[in-house]
Amino acid sequence: MITPYFLENFWGNKNSGFYVLYHNMKHGQISSKELSDFIRERATIEEAYSRSMTKLAKTASNFSQLGTFAPVWDVFKQSTEKLAACHMELVRKLQELIKEVQKYVDEQAKNHKKTKEEVASTLEAVHNIQSVSQALLKSKENYINKTLEQERMRKEGAKQGDLDKAGLKVKKATESYKSYVEKYATAKTEFEQRMTETAQKFQGIEEEHILRMQEIIHSYSLSVEETHIQIGEVQQEFVNNMENTSVESLIEKLAESRGTGKERPGPIEFEECNVSIATEGAKPRKRKTFAIPGRRKEKDTDSTESTEVEAVNASNGAPPGFYGAIDLHNANVPQLDDEGFCIRPEVNENDAKENSFYSSSDSEDEDEPRKFHVQIKPVQTNNGTHQHKVTIDELKASIGNISLSPTPAVHMKRNQSNDELARPKIPQPPLNDRFSSNDLLSLDPFGPTSTGSSSSLPQSSVPPPNRPTTPLGTSSIVPPPRPLSRPKLATGKLTGITESGRPFSPPKLLNSSPPPPAAPLARAESFSSLSSNTSLSASNTPTVEDDVFVGKLPTFEKRCETPAGTSRGPSPVTLASQDALPIAVAFTESVNAYFKGADPSKCIVKITGDMTLSFPSGIIKIFTSSPSPAVLSFKLLNASRLEQIMPNQQLLHSDSSQSDTNTKDFWMNMPALTSFLRKSSEQNPAASYYNVDILKYQVCSNGIQSTPLNLVVYWKCSRSTTDLRVDYRYNPEAMQPPAPLTNVQVLVPVNGGVMNMQSLPNAIWNAEQNKSLWKLSDISDKSENEGSGSLRAKFELSEGPSIPATLAVQFFSEGSSLSGVDMELAGSGYRLSLNKKRFATGRYMADC
């Protein structure tokens, strides 16, 4: 039992002990935060040291591997890597300890708040006794003064009336003084009771606080001690390895690995030449240029070769099968006639046929002339069904360094299917060109309304009536899919719009052939499993899912096929790279808005965004080869403007205890990130970079002030005509920094049997869908009237009046964001090579 020091030492004349104890309790919370900061700083130092040791291990692995000293570098490398792992393990333990400290800080704050409410009565008692004490002193002083004055007047012989008045004053002062004495006694009793309880409570809080702090410090010291023990074990292992690495063992390893053989050259004795055998007309047998050494014909298995012949062959100083070797056993000795001329042997045609290419069953022999049968077939057209073709790269790999001239043949991917070969290849323009060419007209906006999937478009090349004929773009053949990550408006804010949650989930492994490499930071669908469903109940309201808008406006998830041999992503990373690893980040935001009339207060806005990181393919080798790659950590700046942040729980960790609301700290789960990138590389090994969805967020909107383009719609409907006016105004304050709105398109449905349309500026009317379309150039503060303008149209009707409908607007912007959110790397080991920001419309509608 601890002595109640607080109860005995915090009284005093001024009764200020309560304030000292209360502020001491608050200082405990400050101490907890400072301890957390200290441990975090120690973890940062250990992490930096671990990264330095890892670099040192890589340096040791890059040293010369030649000579007898080469195996020693392996010992250095293994020991250094283990030391780096020990320090990284300490970092992990310290990070867990920081979480425990932060949890205690939160609990401590709650307990302090509860204690403050409990000691409120003690604070009142302190105020009461302090005020009563001051009043008592004043009353006592007044009583003394009045009494002395009465006594002075009596001595001076004052009048009786004055003495009576002085007596009354003394009497009142006496009564007041006595009453304050009684009040002080009551206040003192209550104060002592309250203060006793409070002092004991404060001491209990401090005892618990110090015990918790001691537990944290004990865990901290235990983690450091365990690390030191591990470091000692690694050091002892290093010493043992060096002791075992003796001079003899190093020389033995070199002899085993680089030795050239144990057989010494044998003696050679002089042998006389056998002239009788050498002059019998034996013909030397020479090897053909491409003959295989040591290969002999075994035609007569029953016959045995003479050992004498072998001795003669050996006496020539050349092994069997060597160039210039004389085969006396199979020597061709010509027959001579009477005059000394050679007799030409008769050639049997049947024997020639039997030994021909088609009928010979004999084994191949280098001594016999070889016939080749060449059959030239006519060139066949490529029908796309041959699966045994190989690429130029495979030919180069199989025949070595033989140079091949370029060929116009079709290059085929290794795992390309027959269907893919049979289909005609559609040329894909670069990403920027696709963005610029993705307008409504080039993509057949006025085709029949699709009732099926939103990704289907009419394939007919016949243009519908009452519409200018425009050549179809390449992307109209295969329309791009609807972006999976496009945010929706919140449920309940817009009638008919529903939204399903889109949590992060592990990436799906595709069974099909890997897709072509995506452009940097392009949202590759094979790396995302996010899904969402959105519907709009109003049938006359144009939406993003209508056939007019599917694939017409640019999205940020389109693929871009990179030609072979080109690279448009981050630079490749090599294992010997000692510099910071390059990564890229993209912020993609979507603004959804609904304007109702000219009242700004009725505008409903929802802004959502995604953050994506892009990693070069070379970084995967570094992650997988390193036992503890550098932890990627970053700060999310201007986070106070975000209403909600949803990080990828599988890949990202965050510190929820941060006091700074404008900055959020995050760090990657490196094993999970390495596993994800490795799986992505297995799916698409040809890609030079891989995109990873990091987090999603929702921006705090400020009504119409958060919309980049303000809209007001006016309808004037009569039986014969309908007048329409759409006022728009560019709002640069909604963007950071202000950027032009590109590819602005306005779609308005008009019913009532439109016979004729007059518009300013010119619009396109689709009689089949009863919709008018305006296509505007870029809108910015440098445009005419600083980005403000009007769209006017007059429609002549046959079945009027028209019913005012909801219009839809779409646009996008590059190089700017609506939230102002930014990202900053923390720590070392990585560098930001690209920071891309962009936003586009989701459901951007206006009504009268």
Curated annotation (Swiss-Prot):
State the Gene Ontology terms under molecular function: phosphatidylinositol binding; phosphatidylinositol-4,5-bisphosphate binding; phosphatidylserine binding
Cite the record's Low complexity compositional bias ranges.
445-460
Annotated spans, Disordered: 292-316, 404-526
- Ranges for domain MHD come to 580-848
Q: Name one Pfam family in it.
A: GMIP-like_FCH
Q: Where in the cell is it found?
A: Membrane, Clathrin-coated pit
Q: What's the protein name?
A: F-BAR domain only protein 2
What organism does the record attribute this protein to? Danio rerio (Zebrafish)
Designated gene of the protein: fcho2
